[in-house]
């Protein structure tokens, strides 16, 4: 038995990978997170495929359904939003499935952090400014490990991408400030990146909570923070070594500067 776990991408049905789409179109049974995955994408399933929504299922119910269908000899795919590796809760599914002898293939997808960066026309790693991106979430009802508190992570002063934190912006602001961030540090909030009702909000650490409330954003938002998100970054002249004419690498010999 084999299960395919497919990353659907951030929203736009055209952003699923070619491989993911092929598997979706071949599957006899499609289980998908209906609260987050585009119906337009799922509509590309093959005619006659059994399509099951999982938002209302608990773990054992979902895994049991997949096992039942695979034991009937059917090709089953599990479609997750974004990339399954990021907050996809796939490990708990895999543990139960592997106990039953199921082989698993994971097909990666475009995660919302990079869709949000694209929407904001941002590069998250700017030479001489920041070369690090931290992907994390604020601590809410679900705790984070002791050494992963946002205040501690933010002390690196790099670009930070916050998943699952739209209702925790007051806490986010406090932890950024406690980490030594200035109140005018740029923040970009992208609501439903790549969906038709996508919204981009540019703000600062100081005004983050007000901006979220003003725009009515309470879920499905990616928060990008740090000076790489400076709205005036395009007026500056940060340059990488990669395309510097004096820089030598395996595909090009640099020339001496005059």
From Swiss-Prot:
It catalyses: Co-precorrin-4 + S-adenosyl-L-methionine = Co-precorrin-5A + S-adenosyl-L-homocysteine + H(+). Keywords: Cobalamin biosynthesis, Methyltransferase, S-adenosyl-L-methionine, Transferase. InterPro entries: 4pyrrol_Mease, 4pyrrol_Methylase_sf, 4pyrrole_Mease_sub1, 4pyrrole_Mease_sub2, Cbl_synth_CobM/CibF, Siro_Cobalamin_biosynth, Uropor_MeTrfase_CS. Disulfide bonds: none annotated. Its EC number is 2.1.1.271. The keyword Kinase does not apply. Pathway: Cofactor biosynthesis; adenosylcobalamin biosynthesis; cob(II)yrinate a,c-diamide from sirohydrochlorin (anaerobic route): step 4/10. Coiled coil: none annotated. It holds the Pfam family TP_methylase. It is an enzyme of class 2 (transferase). PROSITE patterns: SUMT_1. GO terms for biological process: cobalamin biosynthetic process; methylation. It comes from the Bacteria. CDD domains: Precorrin-4_C11-MT. GO terms for molecular function: precorrin-4 C11-methyltransferase activity. Belongs to the precorrin methyltransferase family. Homodimer. This is Cobalt-precorrin-4 C(11)-methyltransferase. It comes from Priestia megaterium (Bacillus megaterium).
């Amino acid at each position: 038995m084999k299960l395919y776990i497919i990353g659907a991408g951030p929203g736009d049905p055209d952003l699923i990978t070619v491989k993911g789409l092929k598997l979706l179109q071949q599957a006899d049974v499609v289980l998908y997170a209906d609260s987050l995955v585009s119906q337009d994408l799922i509509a590309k399933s093959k005619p006659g495929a059994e399509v099951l929504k999982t938002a209302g299922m608990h773990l054992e119910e979902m895994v049991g359904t997949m096992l039942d269908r695979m034991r009937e000899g059917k090709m089953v795919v599990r479609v997750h939003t974004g990339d399954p590796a990021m907050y996809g809760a796939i490990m708990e599914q895999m543990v139960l499935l592997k106990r039953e002898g199921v082989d698993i293939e994971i097909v990666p997808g475009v995660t919302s952090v990079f869709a949000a960066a694209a929407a904001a026309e941002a590069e998250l790693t700017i030479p001489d400014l920041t070369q690090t991106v931290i992907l994390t979430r604020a601590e809410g009802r679900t705790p984070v490990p002791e050494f992963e508190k946002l205040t501690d992570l933010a002390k690196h002063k790099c670009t930070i991408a916050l998943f699952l934190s739209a209702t925790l912006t007051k806490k986010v602001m406090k932890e950024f400030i406690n980490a030594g961030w200035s109140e005018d540090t740029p923040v970009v909030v992208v609501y439903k990146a790549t969906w038709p009702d996508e919204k981009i909000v540019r703000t600062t650490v100081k005004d983050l909570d007000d901006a979220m409330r003003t725009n009515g954003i309470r879920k499905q938002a990616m928060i990008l923070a740090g000076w790489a998100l400076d709205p005036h970054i395009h007026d500056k002249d940060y340059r990488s070594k990669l395309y510097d004419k004096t820089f030598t690498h395996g595909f090009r010999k640099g020339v001496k500067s005059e």
